[in-house]
From Swiss-Prot:
The keyword Ubl conjugation does not apply. It comes from the Eukaryota. This is Restriction of telomere capping protein 5. InterPro entries: TLDc_dom. Coiled coil: none annotated. The keyword Disulfide bond does not apply. Keywords: Cytoplasm. May be involved in a process influencing telomere capping. Residues 289-515 form the TLDc domain. GO terms for biological process: response to oxidative stress.
Length: 567
């Protein structure tokens, strides 16, 4: 790969960080030039070619920007949200007090700032709060921006170093900002669609099919929205998202949420003929009612992204094979690689009434399961007001019958998917049982006490319990003390000791194989090779232009007092 076009040495870098600035024009010029130095010559050629510009000072047209970002048709709100975000970022580091149209320089800064690795290199700091910058860019609207006053333009007394400029966020107080919940919902929906459509930095984009499923992805996006603010259960327009809610949710339970946006922005560095086809998981999940593209996208925000590089293998679908332990065992137990168990159903809101009047089998289940008292439960608004309940369990070990002992390694975890997202990790090995003598399935439980005339479940402090007929399930969360820790989100919010229990009537149970380590390693190598091959073609294409200096000058890469960088 061609080297960066930067010509500054480490000594020069150090001296520039200590340099002081007194006006906005010099600050913007410094960061614009620094942005250009961060990219390679092939990347810069592709960038200018995609936008059809010769000079980085050229404003980018709205049409060119929309075409490059593959926005869904008839979704004006997401177009406005994202283009506004880019306008704010393009004026970095003066997001509040300076406003200019998006130029080539500005868009180049957007790409760097939205990429975690590039951002750290661009700003020469690994501790920079990238989430705060993104939140500011989403919450500052065009009408909020302040025009530079004559006083601020001529304020030569205030001297700022690079570090002060970067860490000051242009004096924007995030405590005073919020993002309307309906705006955030649109943004999250778009990100989930990108998770499916844009899995790599160099994948061809053809998002017509997934854009047609906007409504399905919106349902999953609502789960993520309620993860940020659990009070969003009714009128979305009356709610908003604070920076604390935004940052906490992403850092704890959806760390991969922004990766697709990174991938999309990196597409500016590839010409169309350098992109490659990438097979998605969509073909393997066509027959599923639960493992939809939208749910798969949501899962990938919190689980290791490597799990979703290869196609998922359908092992057991209850609606097809029947809801029974025997059917599940016959379909799943020969799979020797990691798997994901997904269960979905409707929460039983009034247990006593439902047991007495609607389902005598549930009354029998309550006699065997020690239910928490209603007075002891502390549910948030999302659990109280939303009945749809979905959980996934990632299981690294092969399944096996365990009527007395347990299986499952330290990678086992329960993921709450709906009505909000949280992740519950094990703190010891051996947390799962598959009991074929009437005990059902338990994650985080003790083995049930089974006698000829009675049965007693022993739920763990954090646990997911299935009855032996796969008709009922219970998720319990009463804090520390069990083989699973409280949810990552709950612990971050200091809510781990707020007990609650979700009883639900199972509507779907599915098990999906994730592929073995060998297959995963091969597919990761294939993706890395494809990306390297795309970059190699970039260099070859650029070399073919090398004989025509006029073309390079037109691209702004040589001449015009530039060294041209290194190939």
């Amino acid at each position: 790969m061609g080297q960066s076009s930067s010509i500054s040495s480490s000594n020069e870098e150090g001296s520039s960080h200590s340099k002081k600035f007194t006006n906005s024009k010099d600050i913007l010029a410094y960061f614009n030039n620094k942005a250009q130095q961060q990219v390679t010559i092939p990347e810069l050629v592709s960038f200018k070619g995609n936008l059809q510009i010769e000079d980085l000072n050229t404003p980018i047209s709205h049409k060119a920007l929309c075409n490059s970002l593959y926005f869904p048709q008839n979704h004006a709100m997401i177009v406005g949200i994202v283009t506004n975000m880019l306008r704010v970022l393009s004026n970095f580091p003066l997001m509040k007090s300076s406003y200019e149209p998006i130029t080539g320089y500005g868009l180049l800064k957007c790409i760097l700032l939205l990429n975690r690795a590039r951002c750290a290199k661009f700003l020469k700091t690994k501790s920079y709060d990238q989430l705060k910058l993104l939140f500011i860019s989403l919450s500052l609207q065009k009408t909020d921006k302040e025009e530079l006053s004559e006083e601020s333009e001529n304020d030569g007394d205030k001297e700022l170093t690079i570090k002060q400029i970067i860490t000051g966020f242009d004096d924007v107080d995030t405590e005073m900002l919020c993002i309307p919940a309906d705006f955030m919902l649109q943004f999250l929906t778009w990100l989930l669609i990108l998770t499916v459509d844009c899995p790599t930095t160099n994948s061809k984009l053809d998002n017509t099919e997934t854009h047609d499923q906007w409504g399905n992805f919106k349902v999953s996006a609502l789960n993520l929205l309620r993860t940020m603010n659990p009070d969003v259960v009714g009128d979305i327009e009356s709610h908003s998202i604070t920076f604390q809610q935004f940052s906490t949710a992403i850092r704890t339970v959806m760390p991969n949420l922004l990766k697709p946006l990174e991938n999309l922005m990196e597409h500016f560095f590839y010409l169309q003929h350098d992109l490659v086809d990438h097979d998605t998981n969509l073909s393997s999940i066509q027959d599923s009612k639960v493992m939809t593209p939208a749910l798969l996208a949501q899962l990938s925000t919190g689980l290791p992204k490597e799990l979703f590089i290869h196609k998922l293998q359908s092992l057991y679908i209850g609606r097809k094979s029947g809801f029974s332990m025997r059917s599940l065992q016959a379909k799943v137990f020969k799979w020797m690689a990691p798997s994901i168990l997904v269960v979905s159903g409707m929460r039983i809101t009034n247990s006593e009434e439902y047991a007495a009047e609607k389902n005598p089998r549930y009354r029998h289940f309550l006699e065997e399961f020690p239910k928490l008292k209603e007075s002891d439960q502390m549910m948030d608004a999302s659990h109280l007001n939303k009945r749809k309940t979905t959980f996934a369990v990632y299981i690294d070990d092969p399944w096996k019958v365990t009527n007395k002992d347990y299986f499952g390694d330290l990678n086992t975890r329960i993921i709450e998917i709906s009505p909000r997202q949280d992740i519950y990790k094990v703190n010891q090995k051996g947390t799962i049982y598959f009991n074929t003598i009437g005990g059902g399935i338990g994650i985080g439980d003790k083995q049930p006490l089974i006698k000829p005339a009675s049965k007693r479940y022993i739920p763990g402090n954090v646990s997911l319990t299935f009855d032996s007929t796969l008709e009922f399930a219970v998720f319990r969360n009463t804090g520390y003390g069990g083989s699973l820790d409280p949810g990552l989100l709950s612990m971050e919010r200091k809510e781990e000791n707020s007990p609650y229990e979700l009883h639900f009537l199972i509507q779907d149970v599915e098990v999906w194989g994730c592929g073995g380590e060998k297959e995963l390693e091969e597919q990761i190598k294939q993706l890395e090779w494809e990306e390297a091959e795309s970059k190699r073609r970039q260099q070859i294409n650029l070399r073919s232009l090398g004989e025509d200096r006029a073309l390079l000058e037109m691209a702004g890469l040589v001449g015009q007092h530039q060294g041209g960088g290194s190939m």
